[in-house]
Amino acid sequence: MLKNKILTTTLSVSLLAPLANPLLENAKAANDTEDIGKGSDIEIIKRTEDKTSNKWGVTQNIQFDFVKDKKYNKDALILKMQGFISSRTTYYNYKKTNHVKAMRWPFQYNIGLKTNDKYVSLINYLPKNKIESTNVSQILGYNIGGNFQSAPSLGGNGSFNYSKSISYTQQNYVSEVEQQNSKSVLWGVKANSFATESGQKSAFDSDLFVGYKPHSKDPRDYFVPDSELPPLVQSGFNPSFIATVSHEKGSSDTSEFEITYGRNMDVTHAIKRSTHYGNSYLDGHRVHNAFVNRNYTVKYEVNWKTHEIKVKGQN
């Protein structure tokens, strides 16, 4: 369902406000306009768009925060990309064989933003660098005059006129920026390593997730139970990413942005084999990136004057 949430409330904030409380931020997200600074130097105008694709198993929840700063010679927009990407993990018989079962699972989740507008530039984004921690929390702050800065965590020291936080969980996965330039940024949240009953295993281990029941007819039984699968494999991923862009004032009234959520899928085969003595066991075989860029892309049109958001297309 498409939701276009229009703003109704006006708040006043002191010239140097402390870092925002993330719980309050999430509660009021996209439901207000904030006048920040003495004499209303900055106005934050908020919009939210929700788009869901059952075909791709993806929901995009995008917050658009327009920064109207009298002391900054450009328009600025903070895009917070949230929602859900289903894992789409499935189990099946490989080519109708009786002795080979397959598990298709997400090795990588993809999150990206792109624009082709010559008057728009990417100026900041979160997260940056490679992050291996299970819980990711960072802040993007804004100070009067067009100064965007990031803080390492929700407990970071410092003050901003306005701030936006990200927070997500990536157990057994790592986040890193795969591509970035003045018009786009692409993140990959990739499988890393897993604690199993037989010890720590790399995400590339051929026996990863292979189970212990070679005599079952159910493909699911050839692999470890749900209790041994991390959330990003069993159910899916809740992204929380930020990109900030600038726009040349007086140039174009509208700009288009493509936001992409998706996954790259690996396939693990569990093959029933027998020893010289007739005992059965399961042997793993891996196909890395068997299905790549299984992505849902939505094209949003941003109006810099009216602050309206329109959905212009989707795949």
Swiss-Prot record:
The keyword Chloroplast does not apply. Keywords: Cytolysis, Hemolysis, Signal, Toxin, Virulence. It comes from the Bacteria. InterPro entries: Bi-component_toxin_staph, Leukocidin/Hemolysin_toxin, Leukocidin/porin_MspA_sf. Pfam families: Leukocidin. The keyword Transport does not apply. GO terms for biological process: cytolysis in another organism. Residues 1-29 form the signal peptide. GO terms for cellular component: extracellular region. GO terms for molecular function: toxin activity. Toxicity requires sequential binding and synergistic association of a class S and a class F component which form heterooligomeric complexes. HlgC (class S) associates with HlgB (class F) thus forming an CB toxin. Belongs to the aerolysin family. Toxin that seems to act by forming pores in the membrane of the cell. Has a hemolytic and a leucotoxic activity. This is Gamma-hemolysin component C. The lineage of its organism: Bacteria, Bacillati, Bacillota, Bacilli, Bacillales.
